[in-house]
Design a protein with these regions (language model features):
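Peri-membrane helix termini and adjoining interfacial loops of integral membrane proteins
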Residues: 131-142, 210-222, 341-344, 394-395, ...
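Juxtamembrane membrane-water interface segments that cap and precede transmembrane helices
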Residues: 67, 140-151, 217-229, 361-365, ...
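C-terminal luminal/periplasmic domains and tails of membrane-associated envelope-modifying transferases
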Residues: 527-675
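TM-adjacent membrane-interface loops and short helices in multi-pass inner/ER membrane proteins
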Residues: 232, 348-352, 357, 362-405, ...
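A membrane-periplasm/extracellular boundary helix in multi-pass inner-membrane enzymes
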Residues: 72, 126, 202-211, 272-277, ...
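A juxtamembrane structural motif centered on a specific transmembrane helix
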Residues: 319-320, 443-449, 483-531
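N-terminal hydrophobic segments of proteins, predominantly signal-anchor/transmembrane helices
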Residues: 45-74, 78-165
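Alpha-helical transmembrane segments of multi-pass inner-membrane proteins
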Residues: 2-20, 24-28, 37-45, 85-87, ...
Length: 675
């Protein structure tokens, strides 16, 4: 079961990458061969040199966006499949040869989380296609009132799954490859990511002092915010902030003075990079991580100095902190995060402070909608990767305003609103177990300084995730998992190479519990996908146009007036009635009837109003009342057969399944019953 579940995660991640690639290859045809090639080449090299291959892939972790821009000329989120495919290919050969390698207390939660991701994202992606794969080719539809066609919605869900799933797979791969071998881990993994960070930060510093539009001609360049080589200032700032103290941690694990000098220079560069990004989460990350660095120096390096000297140093530190605070509050600043921080920070009054904390909780309305959705879908959530798809509709329903595009959300609440209580059991148990480990384990003296510094970065990322989503970027997510493993090594190392026996396998009862929870989560997600979270049902709830499956009118169809159209074998329309009743009339073409009796089904608002076998061309009419409180009506039609008149020598290439006519009336005729 251990090998099978890991293989399932790998296959699921490969499928998610494939979906993204196929969809986005329409705008960049070379993306498909590049992604396939990246996976195949990385997997082939990894068969013989897996650690070297992984290091090479990690070297491009923070550089790939700029490289794509340089080669292709523009960057879309999903073009990152090239790097994701290479990363998966580099890990796959060793991963499939080993069982899950997580420490015992973490294995069950992480495997449960991984299986929940692997099994639920396809259901959610199919939901956005209304379980009709043909919608992958439809671009006139929207997934919310603000737009977004079904292919992009499904791709976004796949991208979120890849970010989460590859992170877990990477964490496991590290336990397989470097069990307690911190030095080799540092030489292979940390060195590769540091090299990538150095290039990205150098680009960010150049953007700050030289040309802000260098590799930065998009939104953030126009805002005067550096993005390094990541094209997005927010994750770049977090990466810049995270690695500064980490360089000190790595250098002080060696005896090289050169590396230590370079690490100090890197710490300065990291602050320049995060400052250039003007990212508030990056500034908070840098402050928290640097505070842990100061504490590490104080608690491990200054133990032997006199009490008087320590008192002086404390005084100097307090004065310095006060000066920095006053500078942040009062000194003029036109660059960096300070202007944005000042716009966010509260005034020195109780109402202002209360409003500040309320805004941090609501986060431009995203938190408010998340809280509402948790109440509405508590057990199974809105679906993995779906919060950003449904938030515009529900924000409009709650406030009657359009929510501005943003990524402002509490990460933990974000996972809860997407996965629900059942789907969140895995990640919740893992977060709790790892947090307990980080906060309670005392590292040995030989690595205590570096462990405290790495702990500081982990704590910083955990805290900023209360008000943001930095790890939604796959490079930041991989970095977080890397730091988590690094801290485990530093906290557990004894100064000698130790190879523990293979982690204990999960028992039958544990596996039964895991699969029961996964099955319940998938079932609940599928039920919601056919019920209140079905895309056309969301269109009914939020009153936006939605239709597909009509032969002669797409991509335009007037859903708010009397119309007659030919539906294919399956069609969906969200009507906008102008009266209390909807008159629906359906009929078949003579050519279709000539083939034999045809089964016909029609649903209105999920209620079956017609299910019959038709053998004539006579129309069938039903009168259906609009539900109280609704301004829209969802109509689904299905027929067992269709024809193309062109196949019979006629000049008509349309697929004709069911002729559908709708009209809006105040009431059915006298003597005619309604539904």
């Amino acid at each position: 079961m251990e090998y099978a579940t890991k293989l399932l995660l790998i296959v699921s991640m490969a499928a998610a990458i494939a979906l993204e690639t196929v969809v986005m290859a329409r705008s960049w045809p070379e993306l498909l061969p590049l992604t396939i090639g990246a996976f195949v080449v990385a997997a082939a090299i990894s068969l013989a040199f897996d650690e070297v291959c992984v290091a090479v892939v990690l070297l491009f972790a923070y550089l790939m966006p700029a490289l794509i821009v340089a080669v292709h000329g523009k960057l879309l989120l999903y073009y990152g499949t090239i790097w994701s495919a290479a990363f998966l290919g580099a890990m796959a050969p060793r991963s499939v040869r080993h069982a899950w390698a997580f420490p015992g207390r973490w294995k069950a939660p992480l495997v449960l989380w991984a299986m929940t991701i692997a099994a639920t994202w396809p259901v959610v992606a199919l939901r956005e296609l209304d379980f009709t794969p043909a919608l992958l080719n439809i671009t006139h539809l929207a997934s919310s009132m603000v737009g977004g066609p079904p292919p992009l919605a499904a791709s976004w869900i796949a991208d979120v799954a890849v970010t989460l799933g590859l992170g877990i797979l990477w964490f496991d791969w590290l336990f397989v490859a470097f069990p307690h071998d911190e030095r080799r881990f540092r030489q292979r993994v940390v060195a590769a990511l540091v090299a990538s960070w150095a290039i990205a930060t150098a680009a960010g510093v150049y953007q700050l002092f030289g040309d802000m539009l260098f590799l930065n001609r998009g939104l953030f360049g126009s805002l005067g915010r550096a993005s390094g080589t990541m094209i997005d200032a927010n994750p770049f700032g977090v990466i810049a902030a995270a690695w500064g103290p980490a360089l000190i941690a790595a250098a002080w694990l060696t005896r090289s003075r050169t590396l230590r000098v370079l690490a100090v220079c890197g710490l300065v560069a990291s602050w320049l990079g995060l400052w250039a990004s003007a990212a508030r989460t990056a500034f908070a990350t840098g402050c928290i991580a640097s505070a842990f660095l100061v504490y590490a120096v104080w608690s491990t390096r200054l133990q032997h100095i006199s009490r008087r000297t320590r008192t002086v140093l404390v005084g100097v530190g307090v004065i310095g902190a006060v000066c920095v605070t006053l500078a942040v509050v009062f000194l003029p600043a036109t660059s960096g995060p300070l202007p944005r921080l000042r716009n966010t920070a509260p005034a020195l009054s109780a109402p202002s402070v209360a409003a500040f904390f309320k805004e941090m909780w609501n986060r431009n309305g995203y938190g408010m909608v998340a809280t509402h959705l948790i109440r509405a879908f508590p057990l199974f959530g809105v679906g993995l990767g779906s919060f950003h798809l449904v938030v515009p509709d529900y924000h409009f329903l709650l406030t009657h305003t359009i929510i501005p595009p943003d990524n402002a959300q509490n990460w933990y609440r974000h996972q809860l609103v997407e996965n629900g209580l059942v789907g969140s059991i895995g990640w919740m148990l893992w977060v709790a177990a790892f947090a307990w480990f980080v906060l309670t384990v005392r590292p040995p003296a030989s690595s205590r300084f570096s462990a405290i510094v790495v702990k500081g970065t982990l704590v910083a990322l955990a805290l900023v995730s209360l008000v943001g989503m930095p790890t939604q970027n796959i490079a930041v997510a991989v970095t977080l998992w890397t730091f988590a493993f690094w801290y485990w090594l530093l906290a557990r190392t004894t100064g000698r190479a130790v190879h523990d026996p293979a982690p204990a396998r999960l028992g039958r009862v544990t596996w039964a519990a895991i699969w029961m929870l996964v099955a319940v989560s998938v079932s609940g997600t599928a039920y919601a996908a056919r019920d209140g979270l079905r895309v056309p049902q969301r269109a009914v709830t939020a009153a936006w146009p939605y239709f597909y499956g009509f032969s002669d009118v797409e991509p335009t169809l007037d859903l708010g007036r009397h119309s007659t159209v030919w539906a294919k074998r399956r069609a969906v329309a969200v009507l906008a009635p102008t009266a209390r009743w909807v008159k629906l009339t359906v009929s078949l073409d003579a050519l279709n009837v000539a083939k034999g009796p045809i089964d016909v089904k029609v649903w209105c608002d999920a209620a079956l109003i017609l299910a019959t076998r038709v053998s004539t061309v006579q129309p069938i009419t039903r009168y259906v009342a609009v539900r109280d409180g609704q301004t829209r009506m969802l109509v689904d039609t299905w027929v067992s057969g269709s024809v193309r008149p062109a196949d019979y020598g006629l000049n008509d290439t349309r697929e004709q399944g069911l002729r559908v006519e709708w009209d809006f009336v105040d009431a059915p005729p006298a003597g005619v019953g309604g539904l």
